[in-house]
């Protein structure tokens, strides 16, 4: 029997895609993309902080609650998020970078970081989040 506090659809409860308890920082300046990602991740049980539309807003949210993983748009309006990515990595937080375009070769700040090109599928994101759920980081 399912818990009355779990408002997710039955197919999302206890499945292989369960992200229950995962603390995610979402940094995305496109409100429609951020809303869709947040809604999907929360349906799978993740605790999503944000979305933050700027690096300053994301840094403030980080001080309130350090995430287990961060989904970060690389191009945020007129700024890039390389400084934020470096800060997250210094704290030991895995980062998944989302972007509509990547430079080739990747900037040094992105070396060793998971990078996904937008539009990104939910399956692609889950592929990288599920191992974090299992290990806790």
Predicted region positions:
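Non-catalytic signal-transmission and effector/linker regions of two-component phosphorelay proteins
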Residues: 1-23, 56, 114-117, 121-137
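Conserved acidic carboxylate
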Residues: 28
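Two-component/phosphorelay signaling modules centered on CheY-like receiver
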Residues: 31-50
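Acidic, metal-coordinating helix/loop segments flanking the phosphotransfer/catalytic sites
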Residues: 51-69
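Acidic catalytic/metal-coordinating carboxylates
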Residues: 54, 80-83
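Active-site residues of response regulator receiver
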Residues: 73
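Alpha4 helix (beta4-alpha4-beta5 surface) of REC/receiver domains from two-component response regulators
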Residues: 83, 90, 101-118, 123, ...
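Hydrophobic/aromatic residues positioned on beta-strands within the core alpha/beta folds
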Residues: 96-99
């Amino acid at each position: 029997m399912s818990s009355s506090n779990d408002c997710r659809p039955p197919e999302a409860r206890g499945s292989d895609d369960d992200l229950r308890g995962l603390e995610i920082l979402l940094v995305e300046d496109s409100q429609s993309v951020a809303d869709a990602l947040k809604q999907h991740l929360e349906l799978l049980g993740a605790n999503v902080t944000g979305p933050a539309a700027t690096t300053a807003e994301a840094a403030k949210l980080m001080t309130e609650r350090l995430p287990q993983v961060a989904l970060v748009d690389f191009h945020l309006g007129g700024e890039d998020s390389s400084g934020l990515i470096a800060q997250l990595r210094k704290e030991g937080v895995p980062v998944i970078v989302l972007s509509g375009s990547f430079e080739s070769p990747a900037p040094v700040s992105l070396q060793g970081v998971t990078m996904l090109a937008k539009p990104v599928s939910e399956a692609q994101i889950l592929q990288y989040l599920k191992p974090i759920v299992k290990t806790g980081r």
